[in-house]
C-alpha cells in the first residue's frame, strides 16, 4: 500500500497536547491509499480565529468549524499527486469531543478521515451521499480500532 506524503502545519497559539505527526499519518494512510496511489496532503491545525475566517470566506458561515477541506484541482494535462489541504480547528474538535462524549483522539481521527473523504470527492449534501460517506467513515474508523463515530445518531 502506498503512503501519503503529509505536510503538517501546527498553527495554534499552544500546540501542546495535539496528536503526534505519526497519528495524523496513520489516519491519512487508512483512507487515501484505498482510492489514490500517490498523494500529498497538508493538514493545518488552527485556532478558532483562522477557522472562522476561512469558513466565512469559503463557505459563507460566520463561525469556526471542525474541519475544512480544500481539494487541489490539477490543471488539465498535468499529473500531480497533490490531493489538497485539510484545516482542522483545535478548539472546535476538543469542544465537540467533550459535548459528544467521545474520546478526543477518536474525534481527531474522525476529522482526518472525514476531511480526507471530502478531498477524494465524497460529500454529504444529499441523503444518499451522506449515507455512503458515513458508511465509509464508519468502516475506516472501525478498521483503526475506534468506535463508529455516528453510533449516537443510530441509537
From Swiss-Prot:
List residues binding Zn(2+). 114, 118, 124
Highest taxon in the source lineage: Bacteria
Q: Which GO terms describe its biological process?
A: rRNA processing
GO CC term, one of those recorded: cytoplasm
The protein's Enzyme Commission number: 3.1.-.-
Functionally, this protein is described as follows: Single strand-specific metallo-endoribonuclease involved in late-stage 70S ribosome quality control and in maturation of the 3' terminus of the 16S rRNA.
What family does the Swiss-Prot or TrEMBL record give for this protein?
Belongs to the endoribonuclease YbeY family.
Name of the protein described by the UniProt record: Endoribonuclease YbeY
Species name: Escherichia coli O1:K1 / APEC
